[in-house]
């Protein structure tokens, strides 16, 4: 038997059936740890294809613990792992967009490589993570926002996590979070940390099915729209994938350096997010407005980035986003 055990040799491109069987076997406990590790590393070395990414995501979708989301619900989620250690932009964007009357089923986890992931920052703000995940269905219906904790929503991943940790490098599972939202949303703003992979990832999302999503990556390898330079953007609809470029100027915002939105630990990031929602101006606000504008386009709430910036800014300046966060924390 080869070192890959029940898996096909990943030096050759896998077709859909091969990839689907491989990831089903992996998630269902049909291979040894060392075989899984060898397969994942070889796949990463060769470079994952659209077919393989979609098959892995579908295998995770088939095994998650779901909730029902209202029509038009969106997710704003990044793959993480970009190494820039910025403030929690997608978390703040989720709150701001929900305050614009767009239901948001936020899928996230604790930090893997940064100091503070979405779950860490929200906990530091006072959100009871266990209760939030348990009451996600009710919170989404009552508040228009919920947090779906990846650590509990994907029980099949519990065996894979220590293997990923032992590998100690990026694998296909670093791309999976946004593609396996337990609310099964069909509108997403997805950030990835690999600009060159935007078209591949977008084709995988198209294969899985979406009403309107955008896959974004800053030229610096940022897993969100960057104010520092250009951005790769893939617009994904049932008709296919359309590539475009975007910069802060398109949203009427100034260029900002990544150093201006450098984050810290959960407490640091939570304080920054609270100040943002209380009306503090600066680079963090601009980054949130830029990404929120893109999310509002995905939701069908606005047609242009400048309109989206105006709507998001209004939700902050009128205190709607801060009030929503307070209600979310206090929800019983």
Swiss-Prot record:
Pathway: Amino-acid biosynthesis; L-tryptophan biosynthesis; L-tryptophan from chorismate: step 2/5. The gene is trpD. It is an enzyme of class 2 (transferase). The lineage of its organism: Bacteria, Pseudomonadati, Pseudomonadota, Alphaproteobacteria, Sphingomonadales. HAMAP family: TrpD. Keywords: Amino-acid biosynthesis, Aromatic amino acid biosynthesis, Glycosyltransferase, Magnesium, Metal-binding, Transferase, Tryptophan biosynthesis. GO terms for biological process: L-tryptophan biosynthetic process. GO terms for cellular component: cytosol. Mg(2+) 2 binds at residues 223-224. Mg(2+) 1 binds at residues 90, 224. It catalyses: N-(5-phospho-beta-D-ribosyl)anthranilate + diphosphate = 5-phospho-alpha-D-ribose 1-diphosphate + anthranilate. This is Anthranilate phosphoribosyltransferase. Homodimer. Catalyzes the transfer of the phosphoribosyl group of 5-phosphorylribose-1-pyrophosphate (PRPP) to anthranilate to yield N-(5'-phosphoribosyl)-anthranilate (PRA). Anthranilate 2 binds at residue 164. Belongs to the anthranilate phosphoribosyltransferase family. One of its GO terms (molecular function) is magnesium ion binding.
